[in-house]
Curated annotation (Swiss-Prot):
Function text: Nucleotidase that shows phosphatase activity on nucleoside 5'-monophosphates.
List of residues binding a divalent metal cation: D8, D9, S39, N95
Protein name: 5'-nucleotidase SurE
Catalytic activity, reaction form: a ribonucleoside 5'-phosphate + H2O = a ribonucleoside + phosphate
UniProt remark on cofactor binding: Binds 1 divalent metal cation per subunit.
Main location: cytoplasm
UniProt-annotated location(s): Cytoplasm
Keywords: Cytoplasm, Hydrolase, Metal-binding, Nucleotide-binding
UniProt key word Cell membrane: no
Top class in the EC scheme: hydrolase
Entry annotated with the keyword Signal: no
Pfam families to which the protein is assigned, alphabetical: SurE
Cellular component aspect of the GO annotation: cytoplasm
Length: 255
């Protein structure tokens, strides 16, 4: 079993070291991660400059491969030229903060896992539901347990993609686990306007809005009620239910 582990918080983030440690003994582990925090970069690939890769030194990051790019860059480079073999499983995380609902569209953590999925490799993204790295060991133990469950039936076949959100609790490993669907948030809060020393306006992206679809069955509901959320994801963005309506409205046939 060969496992590739990545993240979006950067190679020095505690979450990736915890995930690597938790997965020891499950197979041969390769680690690749961005040099800097790349949260919110989604599936971006760096196309306007070359990428550099170096090997980190010192514990707990000894041997980690580090890329001066995005999470998707990291996994892409690993799968298309850096590694001499194709991994059997891609893991991403553990992220600091939830990736639920439409947050997943912006998430570098989910994107790193998705890059593996796009290359035909089964993948799992792991996130802690709140920031601060509290109870990280419990989250890592939960991630290990889920990976063990996945592997229990033999090497994964796929591709498939799971998005896992873990409550920040000391008892996370013993919490119920639910297969959920994505909820939805309100739009983000307004941008925050400030002025730089030259008197020019600058803008900070506002914080995420409140959940607006957080009913039973959603990832938001599961985490809020003390459960680990496991959401199967796919890449197909086609609105299949609306194809017929749009064909009729535009006066064109369905393909």
């Amino acid at each position: 079993m060969r496992i590739l582990i990545a993240n979006d918080d950067g190679y020095l983030a505690p979450g990736i070291a915890a995930l690597v440690k938790a997965c020891e003994g499950l197979g041969t582990i390769d680690v690749i991660a961005p040099e800097q925090n790349a949260s919110g970069t989604s599936n971006a690939l760096t196309l306007n400059r070359p990428l550099s890769v170096f090997e980190a030194r010192g514990e707990p990051v000894q041997g980690f491969r580090v890329v001066n790019g995005t999470p998707s860059d990291s996994v892409h480079v690993a799968l298309t030229g850096l590694l001499p073999h194709k991994p059997d499983l891609v893991l991403s995380g553990i992220n600091q903060g939830a990736n639920m609902g439409d947050d997943t569209l912006y998430s570098g953590t989910v994107a790193a896992a998705m890059e593996g999925y796009l290359f035909g490799v089964p993948a799992i993204a792991f996130s802690q539901a709140e920031k601060g790295w509290t109870h990280l060991d419990a989250a890592a133990a939960t991630a290990r347990a889920i990976v063990e469950q996945v592997l229990a039936g033999g090497p994964p076949t796929g591709p498939w993609l799971l998005n896992v959100n873990i409550p920040n609790r000391a008892d996370a490993a013993s919490l119920p686990r639910l297969v959920t669907r994505l909820g939805r948030r309100h739009a983000s809060e307004p941008v925050i306007r400030q002025t730089n020393p030259r008197g020019e306006p600058i803008y900070w992206i506002g914080p995420a809005g409140d959940a607006r679809d957080a009913g039973e069955g959603t990832d938001f509901h599961a985490v809020a009620h003390g459960a680990v959320s496991i959401t199967p994801l796919q890449v197909d963005l086609t609105d299949h239910a609306m194809r017929g309506a749009w064909a009729s409205r535009l006066g064109v046939p369905l393909a």
